[in-house]
From Swiss-Prot:
Directly or indirectly cross-linked to cornifelin (CNFN). Residues 62-71 have a biased composition (Low complexity). This is Involucrin. Signal peptide: none annotated. Residues 85-96, 104-115, 147-179, 231-245 have a biased composition (Basic and acidic residues). Substrate of transglutaminase. Specific glutamines or lysines are cross-linked to keratins, desmoplakin and to inter involucrin molecules.
Amino acid sequence: MSQQQTLPVTLPPALSQELLKTVPPPANTQQDQMKQPTPSPAPCQKGPSELPVEKHPAPVKQVPEQECEPQQQDHQEPELQLGRKQQEPQEQEVHPGKQQQKPQEQEAHLGKKQEPQGQEVHLGKQQQKTQEQEVHLGKQQQELQEQEVHLEKQLQEPQEVHLEKQLQEQEVHLEKQLQEPEPELNLGKQQQEPQEQEAYLGKQQQELPEPQDPELHLGKQQQEPQEQEVQLEKQQEAQEQELHLGKQQQESQEQELHLRKLQQVPQEPQDQELHLGKQQQELQEQEVHLGKQLQEPQEQELHLGRQQQELQEEEVHLGMKEEQLLKHVEQQEGQLEQQEGQLKQPVCIPTPGQVQDIQPAQPPKGEVLLPTEKQQKQEVQWPLKQE
C-alpha cells in the first residue's frame, strides 16, 4: 500500500450511525424475511407451529434445530462486519506512524555503515601484527634448531674447530641483531596505535551530523552502550598487547644474557676442555656399562650350560650307583646261598692239639670275593659253646 492510500480517515458519530443503518443484510437473511413475514421466536421450538391463515389453515412443518442455528449466525455476521470496519481506520492511523519511523531508521543505518570501514582498518593492523609475531616465532624456532644442531656438532668435532666455528657464529648472530629493529621502537609504535584509534573515533564523532529529531537522538543513545562495549574490548586488546610486549622484552633480555655467556666461553678454554673430558668419560662409562649389559646374557647362557652339564653328570653318576647297588645285592644273595649250603654239610670237630687248615670258600664264577674283614665276620667261631 502507498502512503496516499493509508491516510487516516475519521468520521463523525452521526455518519457512522447512518452507515450502520444503511448496511444491507446478507442475501440469506433477505430470503428468510421474504419467506417469514412474522418474526421467528428466539428459541427453536420442537413442536409444530401453526400460522393463522384466513381461508385454508394448514399446519406448518417442523423446523429442525440445525436450521435454526444458521439463521442466528446470519444475524451475527453483519455485526462482525461492522466491528471490522471500525478497526480499519484505527489500523490506518497506526500505519503512518510506522512509515514515519522508516526514514529515521534508514538515516541511523547509514550512520552505522560508516563504522565498519574503521573496523576494517583496525582488523588489517591486527592481522599485520599477528603476521609479524608469527615471523618472530619462526625465527626463534630456527635459532633453537640451529643451537641443537650446533650442540650435536660439538660432540662430534674436535675442540679447536669447534671454537673457531663458535666465534664465527657469534659474530654472524651479533650482526643480525644489529640489523634488526630494536624492541623499544616496536613498543613505541604499538603504544601509538591505540592513540591513533582514539583520534580516529573522535573524527568520526565530529563528522556525524547533528540529530534533527528526538527519535534519532534516542537511537544514538541506544548505540552508545554498544560503542562503550567496543571500546572496552579495544582496551582489553591493548592490555593483552602490553603483556605480549613484556614477554618479548623478557625474551630479548634472555637472549642478551645468552650472548654474553657465549662471549665469555672463549675466555675459559680450560673449563671447556674439562667439560668435554667429563663428557667423554661419561660416554666411555656408558659404553662400558652397555658392554657389561651385553656380556651378562652371554654369561647367563654359559652358566645355564654348565648347570645342564652338571645335571647330566649327576644323572650318569646316579645310574652307576644304582648298577653297583644291584650288583652288591646279587653278591650278598649268592653268599647267603653258599653259607646255607655249607651249614648243611657235616662239620668235623678237631681234636685238641690238631690245627685245622681253614681254606676260604671259593666263590662261584662271576662273583667277587668280599674283603677279609667281612669274611672273618662270617667265619664260624670254634669251638662251639656247649650247652
